[in-house]
């Protein structure tokens, strides 16, 4: 095998060994055995919340172990692929060069997969393994901003669907002409919050407005908020008297009523002024339950931001307002999507807006990790 390829394989082996150590593969196997024992208990489903937690954690742990074992198998097979290619080339077989090309392609693909798994080891924050709640709000830019907010919503949902993650739309407030004023949805997947947390902030779009008769260039803004789903262990207790409940009829695009009953729910947390709405469920009770989940998540985030502000003050640095512009999507006069915090950029905004955002998410995870340890 050529020295360069040997060096590349050795580097990948070192990275994968580090990943295996950080993820504690043997500990993961022990954890799976324990969870499998719990899952086999006939009385487990007497407690629905515990049962869902156990089965979800078991599925995630099994998936992590399969992923690591598959990467190790592929890496161990790689030298064999190069040896076979060398033998074919030595025998002057026409397939020799083709075999080398296939081995090089596997080396490249394996590097991408190992680096992506390495990024997962950075998700060690207190809430990183949680599912995520995403709220998108249109900002400055009128109808273009509302359309931009809906484009962002589609981008994240497409990303989740491509990864076979569950998505639950909790609330959508449609704008009069096009797009949405705001939308809230949940991404049901382990580590969804840690993966998406760095998406929080203001996203800027520059394009020729499809709503302008003179086809002028328009700059639009939308804000993205990412929260971890609250669990019972977070102890976010909200006294009943602290919440005002208002009900109203669900509405669709253009303000058109889509329900003949007052099923939509608006919760106002009186002490803080936080407001949450939910209208996508079929019943008022379901909407109230979903809205309470979002309110609990917002209160948890408020508590975390207060704690972070105190830490920032101790470290002598400014706070981290989530309203800061983080990414620019330019469709005209050139095409580019660029993250303003870590300089990661791509020249294909169409693919990005269709959900191809893994590169930005990985760069964001690395950026957040550097920020948090600084």
From Swiss-Prot:
Task: Note the SUPFAM superfamilies from the entry.
Answer: Release factor
Upper lineage is: Bacteria, Bacillati, Actinomycetota, Actinomycetes, Mycobacteriales
Kindly indicate whether the keyword Cytoplasm belongs to this entry: yes
Show the PANTHER family listed in the entry. CLASS I PEPTIDE CHAIN RELEASE FACTOR (PTHR43116:SF3), PEPTIDE CHAIN RELEASE FACTOR 2 (PTHR43116)
Q: Which SMART domains match?
A: PCRF
Would the keyword NADP turn up in this protein's UniProt record?
no
Localization per record: Cytoplasm
Q: Which UniProt keywords apply?
A: Cytoplasm, Methylation, Protein biosynthesis
User: Any idea what this protein is called?
Assistant: Peptide chain release factor 2
Function in brief: Peptide chain release factor 2 directs the termination of translation in response to the peptide chain termination codons UGA and UAA.
Pfam annotation, one family: RF-1
GO terms for molecular function, please? translation release factor activity, codon specific
* Gene3D superfamilies, alphabetized: 3.30.160.20, 3.30.70.1660, Release factor
Free-text description of this protein's post-translational modifications in UniProt: Methylated by PrmC. Methylation increases the termination efficiency of RF2.
The entry sums up its family as follows: Belongs to the prokaryotic/mitochondrial release factor family.
Modified residue annotations for N5-methylglutamine: 256
Single GO cellular component annotation?
cytoplasm
């Amino acid at each position: 095998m050529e020295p360069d390829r040997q060096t590349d394989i050795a580097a990948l082996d070192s990275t994968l060994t580090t990943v295996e150590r950080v993820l504690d593969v043997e500990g993961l196997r022990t954890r799976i055995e324990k969870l499998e024992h719990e899952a086999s208990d006939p009385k487990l489903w007497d407690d629905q919340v515990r049962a869902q937690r156990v089965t979800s954690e078991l599925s995630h742990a099994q998936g992590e172990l399969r992923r690591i074992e598959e990467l190790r198998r592929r890496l161990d097979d790689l030298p064999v692929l190069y040896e076979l290619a060398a033998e074919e080339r030595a025998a002057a077989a026409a397939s020799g060069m083709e075999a080398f090309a296939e081995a090089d392609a596997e080396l490249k693909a394996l590097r991408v997969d190992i680096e992506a798994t390495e990024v997962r080891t950075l998700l060690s924050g207190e809430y990183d393994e949680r599912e995520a709640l995403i709220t998108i709000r249109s900002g400055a830019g009128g109808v273009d901003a509302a359309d931009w907010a809906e484009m962002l919503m589609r981008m994240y949902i497409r990303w989740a669907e491509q990864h076979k993650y569950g998505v639950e739309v909790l609330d959508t407030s449609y704008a009069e002409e096009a797009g949405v004023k705001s939308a809230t949805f949940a991404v049901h997947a382990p580590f969804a919050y840690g993966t998406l947390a760095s998406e929080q902030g203001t996203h800027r779009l520059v394009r020729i407005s499809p709503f302008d008769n003179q086809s002028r260039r328009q700059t639009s803004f939308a804000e993205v908020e990412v929260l971890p789903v609250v669990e019972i262990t977070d102890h976010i207790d909200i006294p009943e008297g602290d919440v005002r409940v208002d009900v109203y009829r669900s509405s669709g695009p253009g303000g058109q009523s889509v329900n003949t009953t007052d099923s939509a729910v608006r919760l106002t947390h009186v002490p803080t002024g936080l407001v949450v709405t939910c209208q996508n469920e079929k019943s008022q009770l379901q909407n109230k339950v979903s809205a309470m989940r979002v309110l609990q998540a917002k209160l948890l985030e408020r508590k975390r931001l207060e704690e972070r502000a105190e830490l920032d003050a101790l470290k002598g640095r400014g706070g981290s307002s989530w309203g800061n512009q983080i990414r620019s999507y330019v469709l005209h006069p050139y095409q580019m999507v660029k993250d303003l915090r870590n300089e990661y950029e791509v020249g294909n905004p169409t693919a990005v807006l269709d959900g191809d955002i893994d590169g930005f998410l990985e760069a964001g995870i690395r950026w957040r990790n550097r920020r948090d340890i600084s």
